[in-house]
Amino acid sequence: MVPRVPQPGIWCPAVTFFDSKTDTLDLASQERYYAYLARSGLTGLVILGTNAEAFLLTREERAQLIATARKAVGPDFPIMAGVGAHSTRQVLEHINDASVAGANYVLVLPPAYFGKATTPPVIKSFFDDVSCQSPLPVVIYNFPGVCNGIDLDSDMITTIARKNPNVVGVKLTCASVGKITRLAATLPPAAFSVFGGQSDFLIGGLSVGSAGCIAAFANVFPKTVSKIYELYKAGKVDQAMELHRKAALAESPCKSGIATTKYAAAIFSAKAAGIEDAEEKLRPRKPYDPPSEAAKQEVRKVMAEVAAIEAGLS
């Protein structure tokens, strides 16, 4: 049975495959990819995260991806489902769909479409309503970059978590190690998991008490990111730091957006998973463009060393 609180380690917010001719989900490739990631040392998968292009998917497609993931990884591998939307009602619909489709946890962005109206009382009320009605444990998702600049501070997250026992964690894509420090010092890890939202500050987060990270770069090199975590937790800090620095430099092209992340996944992890025509299938969904040839060349150049390391990991 999957624990009530998300377990420490590396979670991967998996990218989404499309049939570029019909602009529909490629579920066969998706299933193969999920299965590969689950064999790569990861603690769990996040389905419908930001890098899955969740806001570009229909409600039916969202449910299909969760169900496909559950089929691919079996009954016991942890799945967290992104359920972000603009209203409480929409979020609750997505949560119920996720529960039926086989998710274990839900990852919830704050409402933020009307930025000025999204006051602290509104945010607290939203998470109260969602957590009380959700059949699945709730993980707060703090990502100001996709939420009109709404940035939940550690005091607000603590208040929400203490009031609502069904809130069991947070993903901090705000990249604040200070928040990780305060939350880890305030909320017990048995009841609340604090995850960094990017792998390039993984060791910084672990050093102050994080549970690990939910890392888009784990789409590209899942074994490498998992190895950094493994080395650090085993007390091999120098080895962990050496690998971490290489991975952080390799990740730099992904900072330009979803297109480069998906391209990197196509030529590395999807290739390792045996998925044909992955570059075409991992183009961003319309209306967004694939990366330029210059960006592709940069990915191949900057990631070459870590690609060789990944290939040598079991």
Swiss-Prot record:
Record key words, sorted: Lyase, Schiff base
Catalytic activity: (4S)-4-hydroxy-2-oxoglutarate = glyoxylate + pyruvate; (4R)-4-hydroxy-2-oxoglutarate = glyoxylate + pyruvate
Domain of life: Eukaryota
Cited InterPro entries: Aldolase_TIM, DapA-like
GO MF annotations in UniProt: (4S)-4-hydroxy-2-oxoglutarate aldolase activity; (R,S)-4-hydroxy-2-oxoglutarate aldolase activity; 4-hydroxy-tetrahydrodipicolinate synthase activity
Membership in a protein family: Belongs to the DapA family.
Function in brief: May catalyze the final step in the metabolic pathway of hydroxyproline.
Protein name (database record): Putative 4-hydroxy-2-oxoglutarate aldolase, mitochondrial
Species of the source: Coccidioides immitis (strain RS)
